[in-house]
C-alpha cells in the first residue's frame, strides 16, 4: 500500500490556529479599504472630541460641568425662592364651588389646619382625600400630589418594550390567536363589542408544562400593544407582615386604573392563588388574604376599566376555584408540547441569528426531539454553538446539532420534569 502524500495527511488532521497565526493574519490579511476605514474612524473620533470640548463636556470624577460655567449666585437665589413643601392630606372641603372655599388638611404627627389655596393652584385640582403639598409658614396648598404607591409596586411596571414579537413564538399559533382576541381586539377595536352589546373577556389563564412559551407569549403581547405592561411574580406578593400583600395588590390595581390601558401579568400565580384550606396553624392565612384581595379586584364592586389580566402557572390543579370562575378569568389557554411541525419551526426561529450551514435538516432534528419543549430546543441550539466554539469553527454544522441532541435530550432525560407536569395539566 503506497504511503499517503503529506498534503492529504494535513487535510485529514487540520491544525487549529494559534495566537501567532491569528496575529499574522491580522497583519498581512488586511483588505484594500482597511487604511481608509481606519482613517475615517480616526477623523470621527477627533470630531467627537472637538464637539465635546466646545460643549464644555469633560471627563470628570464628579460628572459636573466645568467650573467656569458655574453660576452660584442664581443657584442660591433659586434655592431661596423654592422652599421645600410638606406633605399633607386634604380631608374635607368647606364651601366647595365658591370663592371662599376652605380646605381641612391633616399634617401627619402635627395637627389639622383649615387653610386656603396658593396662587398657582386651581380649586378644581383639589379633591377630598388626595395628598397635597403645603408650605411650612401658612400651610397653604401649593401643589396637588399623586396618590401614594409603594415603590416596589411602581418597579413592577415594564418601562421598555420587550424585543420579542409573535414571530419569535413558535408552535403556538392557536394560543396566539386566543390571546390576541382577548387582549388586542378590545383595545384596538372596542366598537365591535359595543355593536354586539357584549363585554369583552377580561382575563386569561395560561397553563402548561415549564418551557412551553407562556411567559414568552406574554412578552410578545407587551411588545405588540401600546398599553402599560405590569409584570408581577407571585412570590413578590407574599410578605412578612399581615396585610402587606393585600395592600400591594390594591395599590397595583390602583396604579393600573390610572393608566389609559393596562395589562397586568401575574407570573407563577400558584404561589398566591392556591386553593384555601385550614392547616390548623394559620401559616397560609396571609397568602389566602392576598389571593382574596386579587379575587375582589378582578370582579369586585369597582369596575375594572380597560385592564386586562394575564396569569401563568404550571399547576392549574392547585388554583382556587373562585379565581378560575368566568368573569374573573374568562379564558383558559393550554400550552401543550409542540408537535413535529412546531418543533421544526422553533428550530428555525432559534437558528435564525446563528451562523449555520445551509443544508441542515431541521425536520430530522425535530424528529429526534420527541416530547421536548421549546426551552429544550433552545438549549439544543445553544449546545450546538458550544460544540462549534470548542472546535474553533465559525459555523455550526448538522453534526453539532446531532451531538447536542444526544447531550441535551438523551443525556438530561433524568432532569426533565415535563412528564410529571403533564399529569397536572
UniProtKB/Swiss-Prot annotation:
Top-level taxon of origin: Eukaryota
A GO molecular function held by the record: ATP hydrolysis activity
CDD domains given in the database record: RecA-like_PAN_like (cd19502)
Cellular component GO terms, alphabetical: cytoplasm; nucleus; proteasome complex
Entries under InterPro entries matching the protein: 26S_Proteasome_ATPase (IPR050221), AAA+_ATPase (IPR003593), AAA_lid_3 (IPR041569), ATPase_AAA_core (IPR003959), ATPase_AAA_CS (IPR003960), NA-bd_OB-fold (IPR012340), P-loop_NTPase (IPR027417), PRS7-like_OB (IPR048723)
Keywords: ATP-binding, Cytoplasm, Nucleotide-binding, Nucleus, Proteasome
Binding site for ATP: 208-215
Keyword Nucleus: yes
Subcellular location: Cytoplasm; Nucleus
Keyword Nucleus found: yes
Pfam family, one: AAA
Biological role: The 26S proteasome is involved in the ATP-dependent degradation of ubiquitinated proteins. The regulatory (or ATPase) complex confers ATP dependency and substrate specificity to the 26S complex.
Family: Belongs to the AAA ATPase family.
Full protein name: 26S proteasome regulatory subunit 7
